[in-house]
């Protein structure tokens, strides 16, 4: 909004030239989302505590200590992230950019599903919430609508292709398979972040690092000279996604203030599903889906641990891990919760750097 209001007057006041720069608006989006999180966080936590007498229902099949230590902690704190991201993005992004509206649609669509799921858990005291098939169907419909818009409205010639990291000219035309591929990327990422959100601050840290990395990728992909130099797909308009990613970074950092161990609030499905969908959408729109699997490797590992655990038990009747997702395995091995969280963050930072390195290694 500020771009449309202020930049047209840069001839009268040269300082308004700043608003043409994506880097400046990205930094301001980070600070705006961070400020909103800090200001609204305490009020929202008090409000959630008053509405949720017993806090988030704790899974009975999880680690026993969670029943004691985490009981009574309010959930649905992800609404704070959504508000901060929305306001910061609307203030600092170009509102004529279709990528902004499509990423917001994915984020808030998945956020709405997560909100419903959280509400079901609280109202009916059922940790399972909305049936999995219902969630998957709704998520799929949202992603298909976004994929159709990208393919037939935004840029038919650009979307529908899969670019491989490291290999400069290796691009595959997915054709009709672009649509199920989009579902795998966005729905998969949304649920992977949700699976990871099992310890205080565990999911929000890697989500923040992934968003920061994709802010750089988006800026490069939307700048012809940068994209040409790096040998990555040039996506006209994608640089505005850096502002959206910046808003996620600021909102995540602000939320972490309240979610760090011991957490005052949990993000809930409303936050985890929304963040995952946001990251998956940005990866799809910048054609860096495979790089997302590297940068968001913590989410991939957590998801694979669940798949391996279930498959192993069904096939041979034995479990590979003491408990899945993987962070629970380390809990049962006696690792302190803060140690697990920080080590997963360290791994996430390393993977983000590796993912960014693939931009240059061609």
Swiss-Prot record:
GO molecular function: metal ion binding; phospho-N-acetylmuramoyl-pentapeptide-transferase activity; UDP-N-acetylmuramoyl-L-alanyl-D-glutamyl-meso-2,6-diaminopimelyl-D-alanyl-D-alanine:undecaprenyl-phosphate transferase activity
Subcellular location as annotated: Cell inner membrane
GO biological processes: cell division; cell wall organization; peptidoglycan biosynthetic process; regulation of cell shape
Necessary cofactors: Mg(2+)
Reactions accelerated catalytically: UDP-N-acetyl-alpha-D-muramoyl-L-alanyl-gamma-D-glutamyl-meso-2,6-diaminopimeloyl-D-alanyl-D-alanine + di-trans,octa-cis-undecaprenyl phosphate = di-trans,octa-cis-undecaprenyl diphospho-N-acetyl-alpha-D-muramoyl-L-alanyl-D-glutamyl-meso-2,6-diaminopimeloyl-D-alanyl-D-alanine + UMP
Role: Catalyzes the initial step of the lipid cycle reactions in the biosynthesis of the cell wall peptidoglycan: transfers peptidoglycan precursor phospho-MurNAc-pentapeptide from UDP-MurNAc-pentapeptide onto the lipid carrier undecaprenyl phosphate, yielding undecaprenyl-pyrophosphoryl-MurNAc-pentapeptide, known as lipid I.
Membrane topology per record: Multi-pass membrane protein
Similarity comment: family membership: Belongs to the glycosyltransferase 4 family. MraY subfamily.
Protein name: Phospho-N-acetylmuramoyl-pentapeptide-transferase
GO cellular component: plasma membrane
NCBIfam families, per database record: mraY
Annotated InterPro entries: Glycosyl_transferase_4 (IPR000715), PNAcMuramoyl-5peptid_Trfase (IPR003524), PNAcMuramoyl-5peptid_Trfase_CS (IPR018480)
EC number: 2.7.8.13
Native organism: Magnetococcus marinus (strain ATCC BAA-1437 / JCM 17883 / MC-1)
Pathway per the UniProt entry: Cell wall biogenesis; peptidoglycan biosynthesis
Entry keywords, A to Z: Cell cycle, Cell division, Cell inner membrane, Cell membrane, Cell shape, Cell wall biogenesis/degradation, Magnesium, Membrane, Metal-binding, Peptidoglycan synthesis, Transferase, Transmembrane, Transmembrane helix
Main location: membrane
Transmembrane segments: 26-46, 73-93, 95-115, 136-156, 170-190, 201-221, 238-258, 265-285, 290-310, 339-359
Keyword Signal: no
Keyword Cell wall biogenesis/degradation: yes
């Amino acid at each position: 909004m500020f771009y449309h209001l202020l930049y047209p007057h840069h001839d009268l006041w040269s300082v308004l030239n700043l608003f043409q720069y994506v880097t400046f608006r990205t930094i301001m989006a980070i600070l705006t989302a961070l400020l909103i999180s800090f200001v609204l966080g305490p009020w929202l936590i008090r409000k959630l505590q008053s509405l949720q007498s017993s806090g988030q229902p704790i899974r009975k099949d999880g680690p026993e200590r969670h029943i004691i230590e985490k009981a009574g902690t309010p959930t649905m704190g992800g609404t704070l992230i959504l508000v901060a991201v929305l306001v910061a993005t609307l203030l600092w992004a170009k509102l004529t950019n279709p990528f902004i509206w499509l990423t917001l649609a994915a984020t808030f669509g998945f956020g709405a599903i997560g909100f419903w799921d959280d509400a079901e858990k609280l109202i009916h005291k059922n940790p399972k919430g909305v049936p999995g098939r219902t969630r998957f169907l709704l998520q799929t419909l949202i992603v298909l609508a976004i994929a159709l818009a990208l393919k037939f409205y935004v840029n038919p010639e650009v979307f529908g292709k899969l670019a491989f990291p490291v290999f400069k000219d290796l691009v595959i035309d997915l054709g009709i398979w672009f649509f199920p591929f989009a579902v795998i990327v966005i729905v998969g990422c949304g649920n992977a972040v949700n699976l990871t959100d099992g310890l205080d601050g565990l999911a929000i840290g890697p989500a923040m690092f992934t968003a920061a990395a994709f802010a750089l990728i988006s800026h490069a992909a939307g700048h012809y000279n940068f994209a040409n130099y790096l040998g990555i797909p040039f996506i006209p308009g994608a640089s505005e996604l850096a502002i959206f990613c910046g808003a996620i970074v600021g909102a995540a950092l602000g939320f972490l203030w309240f979610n760090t161990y011991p957490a005052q609030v949990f993000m809930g499905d409303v936050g985890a599903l929304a963040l995952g969908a946001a990251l998956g959408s940005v990866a799809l729109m910048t054609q860096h889906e495979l790089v997302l699997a590297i940068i968001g490797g913590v989410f991939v590992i957590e998801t694979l641990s669940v798949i391996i655990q279930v498959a192993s038990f069904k096939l041979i009747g034995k479990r590979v891990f003491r408990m899945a997702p993987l962070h629970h395995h380390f809990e049962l091995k006696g690792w302190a919760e803060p140690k697990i969280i920080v080590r997963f963050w360290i791994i996430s930072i390393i993977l983000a750097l590796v993912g960014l390195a693939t931009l240059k290694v061609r």
